[in-house]
């Protein structure tokens, strides 16, 4: 049943992309892509590789291994690959932690702490920028305000789980009370409770170990740099197609499109992000066929290229990573 559901979601994603291409006009999109400045597109691709490097540096800084750039790059790419294949990118942090356990030699709780801290800053910065957009751009005020409120709420929830031990344990206890209603043996439930509560305590303890002004300031700067580099990538794709727009408009479009990707039940926002980006481009005055071309090329760089790299890296370590998952599950059942 789960495999069929995943297949349906993937098929829907592909159908949305095909619908976008048909709506914008395949021949016009091909012509626009052919006429684009491929040198600028290549620079945009390099910029996105730089984004992955910055994210790897941030990950390495949090876990105390900033010098292991190659390993950190691989761990982050594997995590992004998992996020691209899961609804709301929900599997990214877990796979990051598992890959970090194997490649960085850290504890699973440390990897989860690092992943949640990264998500905390990414959502916090995004929420702040969306709030600013809601104030400054009336045409998208409602959706930007909704996105800002949602981002702040999720950021606050991450704060409770990743920094506040008492609150984090209380949240899990409520979730555990729901799990208890499932047809699971009492021994397994007890093992699950002990493993997860000790994991939450370890995760929060590790988070607090680097929660000082200097460390959090560095993480914030790297997170902001990653955001701005992603916006620069999209801005360069606009330039490649000869479309003139302000950098502030690109930031707003990128924020709103990412909001759709986070909320979407489709894997990695596949299909929904392409459609939302093209629609937002049209709202900001970009012709339809160019809007579709820009959206598709940007997603090839930011989504499909990362997915391909992540698939390559994951294939090298898939057996070892899944051995970690299997041993964890067996420990719970034991």
Curated annotation (Swiss-Prot):
Q: Pfam family example for this protein?
A: LPG_synthase_TM
Give me the segments passing through the membrane.
7-27, 33-53, 120-140, 142-162, 218-238, 247-267, 277-297, 300-320
Output a single Gene Ontology CC term carried by this record. Answer: plasma membrane
Keyword Ubl conjugation belongs to the record = no
Instruction: Report the family membership.
Output: Belongs to the UPF0104 family.
Q: Which PANTHER family match?
A: UPF0104 MEMBRANE PROTEIN MJ1595 (PTHR39087:SF2)
This chain's protein is named UPF0104 membrane protein MTH_378
Naturally occurring in which organism (per UniProt):
Methanothermobacter thermautotrophicus (strain ATCC 29096 / DSM 1053 / JCM 10044 / NBRC 100330 / Delta H) (Methanobacterium thermoautotrophicum)
